[in-house]
């Protein structure tokens, strides 16, 4: 075993775990047993995996680990939203947010430390991009949150029956652009869908993208889950300013990709997310332009009141203006919702996932600040 690379079993989806067990001389069914222990029973070590042969447990010791997130903080908002801040090393942290509702519980999962897309209205992009998260770091957010929430409710670990599951929906809408970390995100989502792990349906796992068109096509071919697109502007000139990726994949190309995706998607519509910015993209004329640009894509709109942060120079649209904008869309027969701001008192609201621990080098480069780790009070 000397010199062997230690494997984090959270990094392995079902196929990867079968291959790993095979490398140890074990049969494929052992992979399912391991997967259930890790993802359904929250096993922290191998000794407690009582239906595994002792010889296999001994093989795993020293060769494999079950990685667990390094939680820096755990905060609960007045509205019940819960945010965990997770250390991912080198002065970086990512955030995981649970949003409880009457009939469901939604977990917002991060895929990168920082983000390279740098949307103008999103605080995460202002810290720059540090690195991609691993599969284990992504699915580990779901594992950590599910069992922490169960513990708070007095529910024991075990198979994820509908009556016991706390997290019913996962949205890949946290820090980062998921499709720019495709090789780690897709295995993580496979585990979310796997009946030997979390057993979520494809309709209940949503990936949000700013519009990485080639990877949208690949996702549709390999693992079509529900799709949300961060749109935020009704024309290329404005979207170029708000979502710089638009310069590479403009609206016509993006709309065509949405049409292709719908041919294989588990839902018959795309959700378009639209951050409402006062005097920038929120007029009734913008709404009519938005209807025109999306007319060939079955869709619904989710209007998001902007959550201000100092570096943006932007202001949230007034409530009445958001309602007028929404009414134009509704009058055209398009399902439109206005997102209720949740968790903003703990900086967990949409667009606020900047991480309280910031990469020292990038922070210094961007602000000229001294090289310290900055921790923001929450």
Curated annotation (Swiss-Prot):
List of residues binding S-adenosyl-L-methionine:
176-177, 208, 230-232, 307
GO CC terms on record? Answer: cytoplasm
Where does it reside? Cytoplasm
- EC class, as a word, reads transferase
Gene Ontology terms: biological process: rRNA base methylation; tRNA methylation
Q: Where is the Radical SAM core domain?
A: 101-345
Give the UniProt keywords, A-Z: 4Fe-4S, Cytoplasm, Disulfide bond, Iron, Iron-sulfur, Metal-binding, Methyltransferase, rRNA processing, S-adenosyl-L-methionine, Transferase, tRNA processing
Q: Which reaction does it catalyse?
A: adenosine(2503) in 23S rRNA + 2 reduced [2Fe-2S]-[ferredoxin] + 2 S-adenosyl-L-methionine = 2-methyladenosine(2503) in 23S rRNA + 5'-deoxyadenosine + L-methionine + 2 oxidized [2Fe-2S]-[ferredoxin] + S-adenosyl-L-homocysteine; adenosine(37) in tRNA + 2 reduced [2Fe-2S]-[ferredoxin] + 2 S-adenosyl-L-methionine = 2-methyladenosine(37) in tRNA + 5'-deoxyadenosine + L-methionine + 2 oxidized [2Fe-2S]-[ferredoxin] + S-adenosyl-L-homocysteine
Disulfide bonds, which pairs?
108-350
**Chief location bin:** cytoplasm
What Enzyme Commission number(s) apply to this enzyme?
2.1.1.192
Which residues does UniProt mark as catalytic?
Answer: 95, 350
> Which InterPro entries does the UniProt record give?
Aldolase_TIM, Methyltransferase_A, RlmN_N, RNA_MTrfase_RlmN, rRNA_lsu_MTrfase_RlmN/Cfr, rSAM
As for family, the record states:
Belongs to the radical SAM superfamily. RlmN family.
Extract the PANTHER family matched here: 23S RRNA METHYLTRANSFERASE, RADICAL SAM CORE DOMAIN-CONTAINING PROTEIN
Q: What is this protein called?
A: Dual-specificity RNA methyltransferase RlmN
What is this organism's lineage?
Bacteria, Pseudomonadati, Pseudomonadota, Betaproteobacteria, Burkholderiales
